């Protein structure tokens, strides 16, 4: 194995120097080290730095000196001892020295331990802010994006010029790392994602496997089916917050392929994901494929297919609720469309007690499509588009207009999506 030789050298060759360096700083066991912020340590730091400097000058010509001071630099990065690290760097420590087990450099370790001041020191000494490790190909920015506790390091790396859109060999950027590392329950990388987006992260980034910024959200929504209700609520809240951020920075939730389209997924399960779907439509998301139109997939077709596949009976409350939510979704589609785009061969064959209502709903859409939209409808759509992004209803209510006109501008089903979630 490639690192066995490194182990042997640590133990028999430069480990004594590493131990001496740690000892000069009053560090006996880094794994069990007490807080370095305690007054007794801070008060004696000056004298410890002098002892360290004398030790390094005395050992400067000893065998494996550079390996020893470079390995000690990894310990300083882990503990956040910037003054000691600065001394080691001025006495020959190698910034590119890799941990023999993880192959991480001091910069990677500083990020993993959330030591932003150490990150800045290392970069100012010449560390490559975009360097990737040899095993996982993770950049410092990738590592910083994966945990909410590393937000200070993420901010510092961006301030120091880290490439926010650099991708690994699989095409994965820091934004995709932040999304993939979030589970919506224990790990919420919302602020990391916000910071990356504000720093210019590309919302169109796609891996070689086809993963997009919506892949994680679609996966997490699937995890809510049949799971713990409390966890499902947390996941839904996280998915809403992240979707809102992504849309605000230009992400398109209605692009092909269908299995990577958040709008398509929400339409397929509109009863379950109703609040998020309502938010998408009120935010201006296309209800058809945004690349190929209704010929690829159509929200109208998906909604009616779902209605017609639900047998139901007169007393079936779930079917009545399904119909109510379908009417809401269809109303939002109409409200935000200058001209309806119904799919070709848009025929339906409903069954059950609500078949007549479904047929009437279908007929009304056919009627709307067959006539030119009235001017008042075009004005309504134009004003609502102008007031985006979401929440449009709040902005409509703030307009200096008569209440009757405000009522017309509002969708019949506008409401607080955030409260629903």
From Swiss-Prot:
GO terms for cellular component: cytosol. PROSITE patterns: ANK_REP_REGION (PS50297), ANK_REPEAT (PS50088), SOCS (PS50225). It comes from the Eukaryota. Ubiquitinated by RNF41; leading to proteasomal degradation. Its main location: cytoplasm. It is found in: Cytoplasm. GO terms for biological process: intracellular signal transduction; protein ubiquitination. SUPFAM superfamilies: Ankyrin repeat (SSF48403), SOCS box-like (SSF158235). InterPro entries: Ankyrin_rpt, Ankyrin_rpt-contain_sf, ASB6_SOCS, SOCS_box, SOCS_box-like_dom_sf. SMART domains: ANK, SOCS, SOCS_box. Keywords: ANK repeat, Cytoplasm, Repeat, Ubl conjugation, Ubl conjugation pathway. Residues 360-415 form the SOCS box domain. Pathway: Protein modification; protein ubiquitination. ANK repeats lie at residues 67-97, 102-131, 136-166, 170-205, 226-255, 260-289. The SOCS box domain mediates the interaction with the Elongin BC complex, an adapter module in different E3 ubiquitin-protein ligase complexes. Binds APS. Identified in a complex with ELOB and ELOC. Interacts with CUL5 and RNF7. Interacts with SQSTM1. Belongs to the ankyrin SOCS box (ASB) family. Probable substrate-recognition component of a SCF-like ECS (Elongin-Cullin-SOCS-box protein) E3 ubiquitin-protein ligase complex which mediates the ubiquitination and subsequent proteasomal degradation of target proteins. May play a role in the regulation of cell proliferation and autophagy by promoting the ubiquitination and degradation of SQSTM1. This is Ankyrin repeat and SOCS box protein 6. It comes from Homo sapiens (Human). The gene is ASB6.
